[in-house]
From Swiss-Prot:
Residues 104-116 have a biased composition (Basic and acidic residues). This is Small ribosomal subunit protein bS6. One of its GO terms (molecular function) is small ribosomal subunit rRNA binding. GO terms for biological process: translation. Residues 98-131 are annotated as: Disordered. The keyword RNA-binding applies. Residues 120-131 have a biased composition (Acidic residues).
Length: 131
């Protein structure tokens, strides 16, 4: 089986359906003896340019190992699903399991925000104890 990276963008009005879509696509992959190495839900993000008069979309990234028949089925499903605005399937040489740069940046921002909140709370406690 080959390794693939799949990115699809969902219409922003259909964001509630994304978990069900991910579950359905994951079941199709694992049902055909495939493996999901990485699954990231990037959420709603700004588009670089408008697509069908839309400026935002819900992004999902999957790195999978699956037979060609499943990939063909997924591409057909993406094509005929009105909620999927764009999709891209790329073959990769190896399984990619580490976090993508998008998730790494998000985690770094979250850590910095948490550190800042902790420092602010510590400063407030120190100020209260001095009074």
């Amino acid at each position: 089986m080959r390794h693939y990276e799949i990115v699809f963008m969902v219409h922003p009005d259909q964001s509630e359906q994304v978990p069900c879509m991910i579950e359905r696509y994951s079941a199709a992959i694992t049902g055909a003896e495939g493996k999901i190495h990485r699954l990231e839900d990037w959420g709603r993000r700004q588009l670089a340019y408008p697509i069908n008069k839309l400026h935002k979309a819900h992004y999902v990234l999957m790195n999978v190992e699956a037979p060609q028949e499943v990939i063909d089925e997924l591409e057909t499903t993406f094509r005929f699903n009105d909620a999927v605005i764009r999709s891209m399937v790329m073959r990769t040489k190896h399984a990619v399991t580490e976090a993508s740069p998008m998730v790494k940046a998000k985690d770094e921002r979250r850590e910095r925000r948490d550190d800042f909140a902790n420092e602010t709370a510590d400063d407030a406690e120190a100020g209260d104890s001095e009074e």
